[in-house]
Amino acid sequence: MSRIARLSDVLINKIAAGEVVERPASVVKELVENAIDAGAGTVRVELDGGGVDRIIVSDDGHGMGRSDAVACLERHATSKLRELDDLFHIDSMGFRGEAIPAIASVSRFTLHSAAANSEVGTRVSVEGGGPPLVEDAPPRTGTVMTVEDLFFNVPARRKFLRRGDTELKHAEEAVVRLALAYPEVGFFASHEGGTLFSSAACPDDPRERIAAALGSTSHPHLFPVEERRLGVAVTGFAASPEFTFNNARGLYTFVNRRYIRDRGLIGTIQRAYQDFLAAGRQPVVVLHIDVDPRAVDVNVHPQKQEVRFADARGVQEALTAALSRMLRAAPWLGSGVEGAAPQAGQPMDAAHYAHAVERFLTRAQEAAWGGPLPTAMDAPGPGPGAPSLGPLGQGARPGALPFAAAVGQAPAFGQAQPQLNEAPPPGYFGALRPLGMLGGRFHVCEGPGGTLVVMDPHAALERARLTGYLRALESGKPPPAPTLFGTTLELPVAAAKALVEGREALSRLGFDVEPFGGTTVALKTVPPGLEGADARSLLEALARALPPKSATLDTVSLAEAVRVMACHAAKQAGAVPLSDAQFRALLGELDRADFHPTCSHGTVVVLEMPLLELERRAR
């Protein structure tokens, strides 16, 4: 008797399921990809029990007649390949013909579809890879696939599934990845009736889709990137270094619209950002890499999440060029978005300090003297304290002046160092004599010895609030009596989950946040100074800033969250110009605050122009 036997189709499909179907998220990915390949304009995903109990994926694509509906359950039956050469020109999401029979072999599977203009549809039901039950069904547009009781007949696999909320998180991420790859397709996902993800088709502004995935506050921080070279094109959006996460979950790379988790690509992105981010922060990018299908092999990973490039170095060089160009240009500095700089206490990138100083000086001086800053050709040479840009100097805008060259050589406490080591004399701010405002934004004062002092009140407010919140946290005492807020907000599932898991940290900071069902949270109280803040923007920013659940709650782990609080408190307080009394109160706060030359976004707080420099210009 022969010892080698041919495996049954049922067993073959279950073995294939071990590679293709890892968890509910794998099923979601495969079925949604089929919907996209069918030309769907809208895809809906409904989940129960984290996707273990039920997954329903419906689309409005081409649909299938009876013969195709039955054939798609046969292993290696596919509409994407006809001959060997097709394998090297793949432009569809699926192509192997393994996914549906593998899924049907480990679940209770139902397919309902109809060909276009058909008067009757088809329903095919399969239980655990058994024989299909084929019957007529009402006609419909597109296809609905239902997967129930995943791994019900493979208990060894089912016991390795995680808790429902963990599986749900992976399933939602599968939807998000495909939604980011196809902004022209509408995506709607729900779990037991509660919305997980909702985004209508937005082909004209993919940033709307990114904002739906990462939170509405991401939109103004996203900037286009593009690099086209022979054989490769890199397009997409990258966030300013101020909008970051504490993990790599904001890194999305797609190759020919297929989500790829490639170490080489991720490393290239991180290296491009490394001089712009504070320690422990990760960039946010959504990048599409388009190459000739013949120059990339997508058939090297069961879930197709890894690829092999014919010219990996060329792809990485194009990616580096696209990101470096955007980061050097620093478009956020002129976009109304507070710019990029490390957190307080972190070394500031010299190039970005130069950008921030140049922007501030230009606005202040043009308002005061009606003329542009001198160029590097007619400015005096930098003083001994001027920053040396060194290897980062190429990031500075051409013609940008070192701080000392712009304000003269006389020593002034805010002039030369990207990070100051010495604070001004005690009582310095309280002794300033307010003179008025410039451009509806900057406050102008007379300082000691007739020095002209120009202050950005928003940056100053943020610096003062940051000191207050940090000192309250360092004291170990409960925060001051919080203010009743009383609002409910539906947030992205990741943000809602982070806030609920971080309730202890939020309580330390003076917030009371409670789950309110689904992805809705109730914000009951906020710390003093945040009473009028935009609740949605504040909570989404806090969700990104909170430390992991395992972190010790101290001033180090909570520093980013405190920075977010200070920023939003300053936005609220500075929404309208400060009155004379409010500005004098701010000067008193600055005398009591820990001095730093910039706010946490890199905006310069205060500038001095010595009397000698004014006299020189008046000649």
UniProtKB/Swiss-Prot annotation:
GO MF term (any one): ATP binding
InterPro entries (UniProt xref): DNA_mismatch_repair_MutL, DNA_mismatch_S5_2-like, HATPase_C_sf, MutL/Mlh/PMS, MutL/Mlh/Pms-like, MutL_C, MutL_C_dimsub, MutL_C_regsub
Cellular-component GO terms for this entry: mismatch repair complex
Membrane-spanning segments: none
The keyword DNA damage appears for this protein: yes
Alphabetic keyword roster: DNA damage, DNA repair
Biological process annotations from GO: mismatch repair
Pfam families according to UniProt: DNA_mis_repair (PF01119), HATPase_c_3 (PF13589), MutL_C (PF08676)
Known role: This protein is involved in the repair of mismatches in DNA. It is required for dam-dependent methyl-directed DNA mismatch repair. May act as a 'molecular matchmaker', a protein that promotes the formation of a stable complex between two or more DNA-binding proteins in an ATP-dependent manner without itself being part of a final effector complex.
Protein family according to the UniProt entry: Belongs to the DNA mismatch repair MutL/HexB family.
Name of the protein this chain belongs to: DNA mismatch repair protein MutL
